[in-house]
Amino acid sequence: MSRYLEMLSLFGVAGAHPGGLAFSKAVLQKAAPSPDQPILDAGCGTGQTAAYLGHLLYPVTVVDKDPIMLEKAKKRFANEGLAIPAYQAELEHLPFSSESFSCVLSESVLSFSRLTSSLQEISRVLKPSGMLIGIEAALKKPMPPAEKKQMMDFYGFTCLHEESEWHKLLRSYGFQKTEAMSLLPEDMEFEPTTEMDLSQTIDPIYYDTLQTHYQLMQLYSEYMGHCIFIAYK
């Protein structure tokens, strides 16, 4: 795991994906299945989005490979009175039967996974015609190789694609159809400042990691963006 991901875990950063919770809400309001359909939050982090779905009475299940993040998610669910099943596992080895979910949600998780395995597993656990909703980092334009390597090494990305490449990849891994989604500012509700659930002990080096993250995002803002896609099995 990259030091960046360790930092997110120790800081308990909620909504650590493009747009945060406001973005997630707007995407789900447009794309989520009906509330009786089971959803898997694959890489749930602190459980912020899953809790939102739980309060809407979705039968949601979460999985995350990071034990610290998962404990913080479980604590959130308990504090909010939500009975959400939570499993520690990797996307590449999901502990669920085939065709278990109508929807899999991935918020800035696929970019850190071994795509060949993770997309195969997501497809396996999706019901026929089920959907994968992804909010992922994406390049706005081709990035020079040295700078791209710097970003991948710092964040721990296994891939860093342009939006069109994401759609080609998804179709190559067996998804029948993909759609791009865009949001307007009026689609999103105001959300307060980024929420954190800090671990008791945090090495000062992780504060340096956070500062480097801010610097890289500013330095490479002309290249770094995001994409929202829906892929149908």
From Swiss-Prot:
GO terms for molecular function: methyltransferase activity; S-adenosylmethionine-dependent methyltransferase activity. Disulfide bonds: none annotated. The keyword Transferase applies. The keyword Magnesium does not apply. It is an enzyme of class 2 (transferase). Keywords: Methyltransferase, Transferase. GO terms for biological process: methylation. Its EC number is 2.1.1.-. Belongs to the methyltransferase superfamily. PANTHER family: METHYLTRANSFERASE, METHYLTRANSFERASE DOMAIN-CONTAINING PROTEIN. This is Uncharacterized methyltransferase YodH. It comes from Bacillus subtilis (strain 168). The lineage of its organism: Bacteria, Bacillati, Bacillota, Bacilli, Bacillales.
